[in-house]
Amino acid sequence: MNHYFKDVQTLKSVDVYRVLVLFDVKSHPIGHAIKKLLCAGKRGAKDYRQDLIEAKASIERELAMMDEEEPHDVR
């Protein structure tokens, strides 16, 4: 199985949090961005554009955190 596919045959359903675990996402800002992107505009509270803005902000925060750490940690 390649790195883009995960075996979920034993699971009844897969939520966003399971996806983050399956793909070994360790960064909280990146996990937050992924959740925003997967459900952009579909949660009722915020529109599509606002979710994209917030996902971008989370990614920018991850990059800022990487800049604070030397040498850069390639995740």
Please place each PLM-identified region on the residue numbering.
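Intrinsically disordered, low-complexity regulatory regions
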Residues: 1-75
